[in-house]
Each structure stands twice: as C-alpha cells, then as structure tokens.
C-alpha cells in the first residue's frame, strides 16, 4: 500500500473532530454574514436528527450562474436525502445580482474574472489566444466590478463572474460561522456545486487556503477553464466525484480517455474548459492512483456511466468520473443521492 493510500485510510478512520459550536442549536432558515464589507446570504438546513452534542457532517452547496441559495435546498428530494443521511447543508448565494453589477449571481474561480486561460498561447491550437473563450463568438459578460478603472481585473471580454469579493475567503468565513453555531464534525466537511458552482468547487479543492478544510468534493456539470489543471492544494489525498452530462453543450466533458480541452457549443457562447479526463487523471495521480485505462465502476445509479483510475484502493474509489446521458442539468434527485453516498464512503 502506498503512503498516500495509508494516509487516506487514516483519514477515513479518524474520530470526529467537533467544532466550537457543539452544545448549540440553530434552526433551518435564511441567514446573513457580513464579510469584507459585503453582506452575504445563505440558507441553512439542519436535519431533524441533529443533536447539539453530537458532531454532524456538513455539506456546502454552491449554485450555478444566476442561481441563489434555494437552487439546491429548494428541492424537496435534496432536503429529504440530507435529512435521511444526517447532513447539515449550507447553501450560500453568490454575488452579482445587486449593485454595482446588476448581473447574475456568480462564483469566481481561476480565469473566470480575468478572462485568461491557464496555459497561455497553446501551440497545439491554431490561432490560439490566452483567453478562456473565443471572443468573436461569445457575448461580453463583463461585470462592472471587473471593469473598475481603479482596480481593473478583466483582461478581455471573456470575463464572466463577479470581482467584488474573494469567494474562497468568504467560504472560509462561512464555514467558521457554521462551526461556531452548530456541532459540526470538522473532519467531515464537504463541498458540491452545480455548473458555475461546480467550477468553484474545483477551485476550493485546488486552492491551498481552502483545500485542507474539505474531506471530499463533488462538482456537478462544472469543470475548470482550459489549462487550470492543478492537483489538490494539499499533500493529503482529496477524493472527488465528478458528474457531467454527455449531451451537455455548455460545459461538455469531452470523450472518454481524451485529455484535450472542450468547447461550449450551445449556439451563444464558445468558452474553453479542461476536459473531464484531463482533470480526473491529474487528481488520480495526486491521490496515488495509476494512469492506465479508466476502469468501469458500478455506483448503483442506472443513469450513469462511471469510470475510475483508482480502482482497487477501497470499495469506492477516491476519484470517480460519472457521466449521464443528459444536458446541462443537475440530474436531481439521483445526483444528490450519489453525491451523499460518495461523501459517506470518503
């Protein structure tokens, strides 16, 4: 067994690490948090089986572009499954709908605000630029906060998320708030998100400021922009479940075993993304797995085709690439059940 595998098993076997909020209770509902001079909003779900002196696992769920805190928790099946598995769920709202941007609520991750890709001028791409999109075929979505002359962030018109706040820092503050308010098992904190929220979840896993806070992550129909192929931002393994749609023209996963990047082809945009195979291979290697041909894995969900480079390490692999015959859709409720099952096994 490799050192990484040993560390993973040790993490799984570790006892609960109760937060400072043990002994306290809080009702499900809508709350606010002032962070870096900005009022942030979030919805909280507390399972009926919550006990103030028993540490519970926590999931942070990030909505997609233009969504809000009700995107996941407004779904009855999400609440029912979370209740059944005993998960506290917090769903924050991104920035963008209010002043000064008056655009779509969003989460900012590598390249999304600057408009710059992670691999610069790619010699393998004819006529390539260093942008995350083909600006000739993509509308200008730049937020006013990204065009502020006093602090310009956007390098081109491919920029498409907010520039008002550091979302990684906000996530850290949100987790600290929940940990002070409820009895959270800090060794079992997880992140998931859909579309833009899923892209931000990759950022949380790659960023050294946030990666150590999570036990596992599960991006849904969300991939990093092209060239942002960083492994987990910590030395210990970080399990990941990736769920994508093979008919998705907005954030396509690309063909199996193809390490190339993918391109939006929905008729309105041409954004470039890291392919599902490319990012899962990088994370598989970081998690101590080999890089042969991905092996099939039965996740118990008829709708999905799941494959992994991490077969044989445990009953559930640490990196799992699941694709369903669907478009740019979350696949609720089956995807939420799968996400929680993956978290249970991580």
Q: For the regions a protein language model found, what residue spans apply to each?
A:
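Structural cue for short, hydrophobic secondary-structure segments
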Residues: 61-64, 91, 243
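A domain-start/cap signature at the N-terminus of enzymes
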Residues: 12-58, 70-76, 84-88, 156-159, ...
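The feature captures the conserved acid-bearing segment of alpha/beta-hydrolase catalytic domains
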Residues: 50, 211-316, 326-329
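Conserved alpha/beta-hydrolase
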Residues: 86-97
């Amino acid at each position: 067994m490799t050192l990484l595998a040993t560390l993973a098993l040790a993490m799984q076997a570790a006892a609960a690490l109760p937060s400072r909020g043990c002994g306290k209770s809080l009702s499900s509902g809508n709350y606010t948090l002032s962070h870096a001079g900005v009022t942030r909003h979030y919805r909280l779900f507390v399972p009926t089986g919550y006990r103030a002196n028993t540490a519970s696992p926590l999931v942070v769920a990030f909505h997609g572009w233009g969504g809000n805190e009700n995107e996941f928790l407004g779904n009855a099946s999400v609440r029912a499954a979370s209740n059944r598995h005993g998960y506290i769920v917090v769903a924050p709202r991104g920035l963008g709908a209010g002043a000064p941007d008056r655009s779509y609520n969003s989460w900012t991750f590598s390249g999304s605000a600057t408009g710059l890709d992670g691999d610069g001028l790619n010699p393998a791409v004819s006529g390539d630029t260093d942008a995350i999109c083909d600006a000739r075929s993509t509308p200008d979505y730049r937020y006013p906060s990204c065009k502020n002359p006093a602090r310009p962030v956007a390098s081109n018109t491919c920029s498409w998320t907010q520039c008002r706040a550091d979302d990684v820092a906000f996530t850290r503050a949100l987790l600290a708030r929940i940990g002070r308010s409820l009895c959270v098992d800090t060794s079992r904190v997880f992140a998931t998100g859909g579309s833009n929220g899923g892209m931000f979840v990759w950022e949380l896993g790659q960023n050294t400021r946030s990666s150590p806070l999570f036990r596992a992550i599960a991006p849904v129909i969300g991939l990093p922009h092209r060239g942002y192929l960083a492994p987990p931002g910590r030395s210990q393994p970080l399990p990941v479940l990736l769920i994508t749609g093979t008919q998705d023209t907005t954030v396509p996963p690309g063909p199996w075993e193809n390490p190339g990047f993918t391109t939006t082809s929905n008729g309105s945009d041409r954004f470039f993304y890291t392919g599902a195979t490319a990012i899962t291979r990088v994370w598989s290697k970081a998690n101590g797995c080999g890089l042969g041909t991905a092996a099939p894995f039965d996740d118990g969900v008829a709708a999905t085709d799941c494959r992994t480079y991490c077969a044989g390490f445990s009953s559930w692999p640490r990196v799992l690439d699941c694709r369903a015959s669907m478009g740019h859709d979350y696949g609720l409720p089956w995807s939420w059940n799968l996400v929680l099952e993956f978290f249970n096994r991580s």
